[in-house]
């Protein structure tokens, strides 16, 4: 059962929401334009606001549902964590798109909303605050990722816990996926939310 949960979580994460929306609404391949990501931000820049919101909600749902399925069928915290990271892996490296997907932010949010809604909402709050102040989605995502393990530590009250370790892994993964954005931020070349790439 555990293997089935993990495999299903990966397939759920692999659902190429942004790619399908881009193809259906504008006949474009998001992997070849803008940032090359199939996530909500690239959808926003190249397809539109409402399609981007739809993609964001679905991508959050992928992480949340994967963990909730694991919680329903098992009481093992480790399986919940693996299910969540499997959904994130599917989102980043979707089998249907030859491994070229999103940057794990929305699906990661969904995962942590399921594991600890307080930590998930705190991270979302940081994202929104930084976005409001700077208009940089990438900086907002990176800021939320950096603070995620800190929020998880305060929630748990200890370091030695699978939730803390996975929050650290996801944070590092999100930062790594934004490495080109970090270079552009340093050079002053990163696009703001109201700018085209």
Curated annotation (Swiss-Prot):
It is a multi-pass membrane protein. The keyword Lipid metabolism applies. One of its GO terms (cellular component) is plasma membrane. Pfam families: G3P_acyltransf. Pathway: Lipid metabolism; phospholipid metabolism. The keyword tRNA processing does not apply. GO terms for molecular function: acyl-phosphate glycerol-3-phosphate acyltransferase activity. It is an enzyme of class 2 (transferase). Its main location: membrane. It catalyses: an acyl phosphate + sn-glycerol 3-phosphate = a 1-acyl-sn-glycero-3-phosphate + phosphate. InterPro entries: G3P_acylTferase_PlsY. Its EC number is 2.3.1.275. Keywords: Cell inner membrane, Cell membrane, Lipid biosynthesis, Lipid metabolism, Membrane, Phospholipid biosynthesis, Phospholipid metabolism, Transferase, Transmembrane, Transmembrane helix. The chain crosses the membrane at residues 1-21, 50-70, 77-97, 111-131, 136-156, 157-177. It is found in: Cell inner membrane. GO terms for biological process: phospholipid biosynthetic process. Probably interacts with PlsX. Catalyzes the transfer of an acyl group from acyl-phosphate (acyl-PO(4)) to glycerol-3-phosphate (G3P) to form lysophosphatidic acid (LPA). This enzyme utilizes acyl-phosphate as fatty acyl donor, but not acyl-CoA or acyl-ACP. Belongs to the PlsY family. This is Glycerol-3-phosphate acyltransferase. The gene is plsY.
